[in-house]
């Protein structure tokens, strides 16, 4: 989803939850200090900057959209015109070149963009090919089966239509921003992601429990409890 909706607007609740879940997972692993890190489908670079600011030895961001990479680089250089801490590349995830090896890769809403099973498996293989043995992939992926049973609009996203067909149903959705932003993705099952990861050479695949930020005045604990009962996403943890 990120590839299609990355904007400069304040983050929606589901995006805030995603960022918290990813940071929590990174902290549980001991952080990224001294690691070589890769962020695939980096968008405007928020996760890549998180990795760099955490002390990664090297951080590389990859995205298929030249404009998103341009904006990510612009954010890095700022007004000084100096090179930033993140190295950015324009590349399609399924055909990503050898940029590593890396100790850690992150992918936020990458794999749901695969239009068929061939592309899905190619994405996982390209990520695995850039990782050292024992390295880790942390991927945030959408949860399937929500439409039409779950309303995610209070958290910033609405599924509008689900069309069966192909290797996975096509979802038409929109971000509840002002103005709304429409996007499409595929509704892959968790088992499809796991199968592709194992096929790519990952030794283990695990799923992290959903975690949400502490309650605040804007989003209290009942709000987050409702979110946890039917979360937008899950965190996939794969070891090479």
Which sequence ranges carry the predicted segments?
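Class I SAM-dependent methyltransferase SAM/SAH-binding core
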Residues: 38, 44-95
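SAM-dependent methyltransferase
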Residues: 138-198
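C-terminal lobe and adjacent flexible extensions of AdoMet/dcAdoMet transferase-like proteins
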Residues: 196, 200-240
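Conserved class I S-adenosyl-L-methionine
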Residues: 1-32, 46, 50
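Short catalytic micro-motifs in class I SAM-dependent methyltransferases
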Residues: 109-113
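A conserved beta-strand element that flanks and buttresses the S-adenosyl-L-methionine
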Residues: 106
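A short glycine-rich, Lys/Arg-flanked "PGG" loop and its adjoining helix->strand segment in the class I
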Residues: 121-133
């Amino acid at each position: 989803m990120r590839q299609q909706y990355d904007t400069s607007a304040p983050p929606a609740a589901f995006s805030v939850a995603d960022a918290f879940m990813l940071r929590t997972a990174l902290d549980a692993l001991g952080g990224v200090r001294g690691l070589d890190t890769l962020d695939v489908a980096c968008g405007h670079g928020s996760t890549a900057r998180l990795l760099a600011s955490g002390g990664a030895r090297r951080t590389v961001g990859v995205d298929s959209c030249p404009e998103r990479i341009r904006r990510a680089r612009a954010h890095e250089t700022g007004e000084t015109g100096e090179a930033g801490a993140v190295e950015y590349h324009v590349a399609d995830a399924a055909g990503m070149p050898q940029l590593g090896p890396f100790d850690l890769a992150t992918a936020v809403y990458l794999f749901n963009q695969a239009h068929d099973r061939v592309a899905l498996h190619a994405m996982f293989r390209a990520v695995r090919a850039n990782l050292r043995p024992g390295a880790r992939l942390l991927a945030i992926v959408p949860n399937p089966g929500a439409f039409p049973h779950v309303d995610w609009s209070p958290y910033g996203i609405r599924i509008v239509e689900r069309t069966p067909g192909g290797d996975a149903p096509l979802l038409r959705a929109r971000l509840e921003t002002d103005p709304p932003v429409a996007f499409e993705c595929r509704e892959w099952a968790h088992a499809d992601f796991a199968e592709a990861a194992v096929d790519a050479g990952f030794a283990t695949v695990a799923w992290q429990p959903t975690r949400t930020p502490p309650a605040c005045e804007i989003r209290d604990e009942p709000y987050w409890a409702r979110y946890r009962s039917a979360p937008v996403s899950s965190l996939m943890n794969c070891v090479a």
